[in-house]
From Swiss-Prot:
This is Olfactory receptor 5AS1. Residues 1-25, 76-99, 155-196, 259-271 are extracellular. It is found in: Cell membrane. Belongs to the G-protein coupled receptor 1 family. Its main location: membrane. The gene is OR5AS1. One of its GO terms (cellular component) is plasma membrane. Disulfide bonds join C97-C189. One of its GO terms (molecular function) is odorant binding.
Length: 324
């Protein structure tokens, strides 16, 4: 450990979930399956949106960006976590820790803004259909995306810089499975009040404001839906809105629970369980909740599979001709 006014360990050690090897192997297999499904589902959605002309609209443009963020957010955490399940020494360098913290926080904050943009897009389409092309023009969509990535990167960089200016002259054992801000603040032997206040302020602003936008948008949508005379149209829209609201509530609930509580009441074991859901599990379910229940996406997927099947059939026929 470096001895100076600014003290930083040469490495951080993760406690992880358990030291019992059979359970670690089981968790490795479970999370490997979850990560694989996350990658396949989100990559497939991105491909569908980009190759299908019927999906070239703002809603699916935001969905493809959400899928990219889910892939990125999960990739920032899961590969290292999987490696640590099978490693005897679950360590990470300070630079690796800083990078992991930066990328995860960037993608998580950007995802909050993308979810808000998606809710606003649905509000514009259902509540103001005549103004939809103006409210959700290509320029507006690009501005939403740029704002999401820029604000996510900026706030994340601030957190990382302030966190790694602290001294860690005590233990270097992180009771977590990745480098997150609260457990590192708990390890510091210097005053972390500024860090805690800034974490609370930025998280309150980004997470609370975007959640309010989402809630108001869906509330207006539901009010509009109540005026629909067709019971079938009402039930379909209610079903879609309900699934989206449940997913958003769970995602934001986990984030608010993690980052808007004081360090003094920080429960390491409880927060690890909560963190698993928003870092590993939610990215797997987002494509199902937001996309694959959608008729347009199902049709696009069906056409893609038919195209692949036709290509394979054509290739096999060519092989038969050559063999003859």
């Amino acid at each position: 450990m470096l001895e100076s006014n600014y003290t930083m360990p040469t490495e951080f050690l993760f406690v992880g979930f358990t030291d019992y090897l059979p359970l670690r192997v089981t968790l490795f297999l479970v999370f490997l399956l979850v990560y694989t499904l996350t990658m396949v589902g989100n990559i497939l959605l991105i491909i569908l949106v980009n190759i299908n002309s019927s999906l070239q609209i703002p809603m699916y443009y935001f969905l493809s960006n959400l899928s990219f963020l889910d892939i990125s957010c999960s990739t920032a955490i899961t590969p290292k976590m999987l490696a640590n399940f099978l490693a005897s020494r679950k360590s990470i360098s300070p630079y690796g820790c800083a990078l992991q913290m930066f990328f995860f926080a960037s993608f998580a904050d950007a995802e909050c803004l993308i979810l808000a943009a998606m809710a606003y897009d649905r509000y514009a389409a259902i509540c103001n259909p005549l103004l939809y092309t103006t409210l959700m023009s290509r320029r507006v969509c690009v501005c939403f995306i740029v704002l999401a990535y820029f604000s996510g990167s900026t706030t994340s960089l601030v957190h990382v810089c302030l966190t790694f200016r602290l001294s860690f002259c005590g233990s270097n054992i992180v009771n977590h499975f990745f480098c997150d801000i609260p457990p590192l603040l708990a390890l510091s032997c210097t005053d972390t009040q500024i860090n805690q206040l800034l974490l609370f302020a930025l998280c309150s602003f980004i997470q609370t404001s975007t959640f309010v936008v989402i809630f108001i948008s869906y509330f207006c949508i539901l009010i509009t839906v109540l005026s629909i005379k067709s019971s079938g149209g009402r039930s379909k829209t209610f079903s879609t809105c309900a699934s989206h609201l449940i997913a958003v509530t769970l995602f934001y609930g986990a984030l608010l629970f993690m980052y808007l509580q004081p360090t003094t009441s920080y429960s390491l074991d409880t927060d690890k369980v909560v963190a698993v859901f928003y870092t590993v599990v939610f990215p797997m379910f987002n494509p199902i909740i937001y996309s694959f229940r959608n008729k347009d996406v199902k049709n696009a997927l069906k056409k893609l599979l038919e195209r692949i099947g036709y290509s394979n059939e054509w290739y096999l026929n060519r092989l038969r001709i050559v063999n003859i």
